[in-house]
A protein has these predicted regions:
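Extended, charge-rich alpha-helical interface modules
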Residues: 1-104
Length: 104
């Protein structure tokens, strides 16, 4: 399903500012993804299992850090999924420019 969103701006400079803001946000998402993947690798190395295995088969009692370790690992995995989804949406966005001003 496709959704169309229209943003009216006063001038072309405003459009450039919006596009730049989106690019900056995508860069921040990429950095967040990298940081989160590093954290997940740390958990995987510490416990000797993949995040997928952890999410499918493990409980808090299975980890040396118990509940807190479990919650942090699961939270990082959930965060990664959300960041990747958001970045994917923005990367698939299409932008079109039209002039709706009556004097042009």
């Amino acid at each position: 399903m496709s959704v169309q969103m229209v943003i009216e701006l006063a001038d072309r400079q405003g459009a450039q500012a919006v596009l730049q803001a989106l690019e900056t946000y995508k860069t921040r998402l990429r950095l967040g993804i990298e940081r989160t993947r590093r954290r997940l690798r740390e958990f995987e190395q510490r416990h000797g299992v993949t995040t997928a295995h952890f999410l499918e088969r493990m409980a808090a009692e299975d980890l040396s850090g118990d509940d807190l370790e479990y919650v942090e690992w699961a939270g990082e995995a959930k965060l990664l999924k959300g960041l990747e989804t958001e970045l994917r949406e923005l990367e698939h966005a299409r932008f079109a420019s039209t002039n709706t001003s009556p004097d042009h």
